[in-house]
Amino acid sequence: MKNLISLLVLVAITLVSSNSFSYNSEPKLFIEELVGDAIKTLSDKNISKADKSKKIETIALENVDIDALGMYTLGVVRNTLDQETLKKYNELFQKYFLKSLTSRLTDYSENKFEITSADQKSETYTIVKSKIVKSSTQPEIKINWRVYTKDLTKPLIRDLIVEGLSLAKTQKEEFSSILNSNNNDINILFLKLEEFINN
């Protein structure tokens, strides 16, 4: 699961908020405000690492469609599970996602971002394009945000594509590999998630 952490770190640094409020509902401005808010918060030396992590969790829960991401990454196996098992999976996935999101936050506290454009693919999806600006220690990194806009008043992030690599697809492939190697035993996946959460 370590191969996913670097992608989650990139979304982490844009989901920190110094105040709890609703962001603009227009996709490009929605992402732009998240980015600007993150930079302001992460550069504040008076905010502890623990507090930053708490802010990430709050903002992620409000602005990332974690449930939809979790169901997608589980794949077709979800159709074979009862409601109680799905509930357990959703709870574990949320904890896994949030821990991954905060795992290496401080490594990216000085990064600068730019929103470059927005491409409305349909009535319900817009791709917002951005990049991490090249620095002396890091190359430029292109990041595309898949923003779900079925509810026009509440956009949600459903995927992140970093240098062409989809966060959702990467996670789905990893979970699929674990399940396929263990006769689709969901309990093995639960153990893997719990190991990461408790590590």
Each predicted region: which residue ranges?
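Short beta-strand edge/turn micro-motifs at domain boundaries
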Residues: E140-K142, R146-K169
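A mature extracytoplasmic/lumenal domain signature
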Residues: T73, F93, S117-D119, I132-K134, ...
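Early exported N-terminus immediately downstream of N-terminal targeting peptides
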Residues: S25-S103
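Low-complexity, intrinsically disordered terminal/linker segments enriched in charged
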Residues: D159-N199
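Surface-exposed, charged secondary-structure patches
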Residues: K99-I141, F196-N199
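N-terminal signal peptide c-region/cleavage motif recognized by signal peptidases
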Residues: S17-N19
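Sec-dependent signal peptide recognition
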Residues: K2-L10
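Boundary of Sec targeting at the N-terminus
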Residues: F21-Y23
